[in-house]
């Protein structure tokens, strides 16, 4: 069973699904859904349509260069069936998929980490600019007034003791 890739959005096309367009020069285009086919007929560039994988990779939102993608290459050489080889291949596919998922998650977290740092710097700058909203201009005056009141009370007590 071969799972093809959509020409427009790079999504998976399972056997019996999607549609195929064959141009006069025998170039084959496979589409997963009518939305992709319509956009192809309108001559839209997949790298400029925001929901396609081509856009996400071109914009740096997804992992583009990695050794795990080498395993997905199309191979047209038939291999003689051997049960042991088949089992090893399936185990290797699971392992490669697991590694790929981990690397993609790490890539996304690193990409989001930059934004968190920028947001933190921007928040600090905003607080420094608007510090007067947080700290009232008379905030330190309360203690000074309290100290003056205490001094006046002590002076009054001293005056009464002296008389």
UniProtKB/Swiss-Prot annotation:
Coiled coil: none annotated. InterPro entries: L24e/L24_sf, Ribosomal_eL24, Ribosomal_eL24-rel_arc, Ribosomal_eL24-rel_N, Ribosomal_eL24_CS, TRASH_dom. The keyword Nucleus applies. GO terms for cellular component: nucleolus. Disulfide bonds: none annotated. GO terms for molecular function: structural constituent of ribosome. The keyword Transcription does not apply. It holds the Pfam family Ribosomal_L24e. SUPFAM superfamilies: Glucocorticoid receptor-like (DNA-binding domain) (SSF57716). It is found in: Nucleus, Nucleolus. Keywords: Nucleus, Ribosome biogenesis. Belongs to the eukaryotic ribosomal protein eL24 family. Associated with nucleolar and cytoplasmic pre-60S particles. At the end of biogenesis it dissociates from cytoplasmic pre-60S particles and is likely to be exchanged for its ribosomal homolog, RPL24. This is Probable ribosome biogenesis protein RLP24. It comes from Rattus norvegicus. The gene is Rsl24d1.
